[in-house]
Amino acid sequence: MALVDVQAQDKLKNMPGYEQYREIAPQIRRSVKPGTLYVNWEEDGKSFTYVQDGKQWQYDIRKKKATELGAPPAVERRPRGFRPARGRQYPSAESPDGNWRAYTENRNMYLSKPDGSGKMAITTDGNMENMNKYGIATWVYGEELGQNTAMWWSPDSKKIAFYKFNEKGAKQYYVLLDQLQLYDSLEIMSYPKVGEPNLPVDLMVYDLETKEMMQFDVRDGKDFDDGPLGTYLYGMSWTPDGKEFLYHSTNRKQDIMEYRAGNPETGETRVVVREEWLASFTKNTPEMRVLADGEHFIWASERTGFNNYYLYNWDGTLVNPITQHEFEVANIVRVDEEDGVMYYMARSGDNHMKMQLHRVRLDGKKDTRLTDPSMNHSVDIAPDGKHFIDIVQTHNTPPRTLLIDDKGKELDVF
């Protein structure tokens, strides 16, 4: 096959017009300007740098002037890190303080120092006889729920939470691995197909100081029933102060979803936000932004039929809707807690495909669209929020890069 490819490429040189193509191809590339400019803002928001025509420039907003800085810096290629295979989870997690490594091995959870010394088991009943397994999820979690982690350290590195699954009664599925190697391998997994019961799932938490294990009450004292809430547990994290463990819980139909918080000292859990859309389905992991004040978070919900943003307290109290649109909000761009404002993209153009930048107060007041609704926009906001770079285009209008102020006024074009 490789020989055929080489011969085909050699024949190209003998085609009519090949020499003319070689001569004009570089000219064509240089004659077309892309129209898109990607910038790096300075921390004070008063200037930014960018690369254009093979040179690096610095633009001063006050002077509206670009100064050439010379050749652009070399692009630093970061080595590609380890990623779990499709449908799988990371097999280990290092503690935030760097002193511990948690990992799963032979269906049990272990702790050790980062160099592997001081190994100790924190579970011992994970085996093929009782079909328990810890620190790893089933295929559906990675494949359909995007869950690529199975263990989660508290911010102070004193606790580690992790999955527990029981695979009793589940039918076995045979997977052939390493098919590109000299010798392949076989993995047997418990995999419920359509109509088969799902596997019981629980969440455990281990305290490194007290050496005590706690199981979270993820189903309000009820056993796993493969249908009600608690069928799937996913989207885990800790609160910034480490006092509660957060997770999403949904039923098999996925038309009810609860965002819940668990007490790692008692195992008790509570509902923070509940979403229900019985006519269809709820989004598995709605967009969320935790605020730096440690008391509030922003939550996206389609409860009105349109995706909007809501401000919540951690106790589950709705403070206020931030947006109340009859069009879809798309994503949060920036939250300025000091000024109490949020910038976000929304489908509020003259058709829903054209993304627009909005600014709104966190109390839901003074929602303002800052961009031209006849165009589609991609923005990069300055750190001080006073300006933004705006790449504007439509399906039949070439992209242009603009400098816009916080009132929506165009200041310059690049």
Region locations from a protein language model:
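A conserved hydrophobic secondary-structure block that centers on an alpha-helix together
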Residues: 82-129, 223-226, 235
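Non-catalytic accessory segments flanking enzyme active sites
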Residues: 36-40, 45-47, 51-56, 66-76, ...
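Predominantly five- to eight-bladed beta-propeller fold
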Residues: 12-18, 64-78, 82, 122-151, ...
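Beta-strand C-termini and the immediately following turn/loop, strongest in propeller blades
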Residues: 49-54, 60, 101-107, 113, ...
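Short loop/turn segments that connect beta-strands within beta-propeller blades
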Residues: 61-64, 114-117, 208-211, 264-267, ...
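Signature of short aromatic-glycine-proline-rich micro-motifs recurring in repeat-based ectodomains
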Residues: 32-39, 86-91, 135-155, 229-238, ...
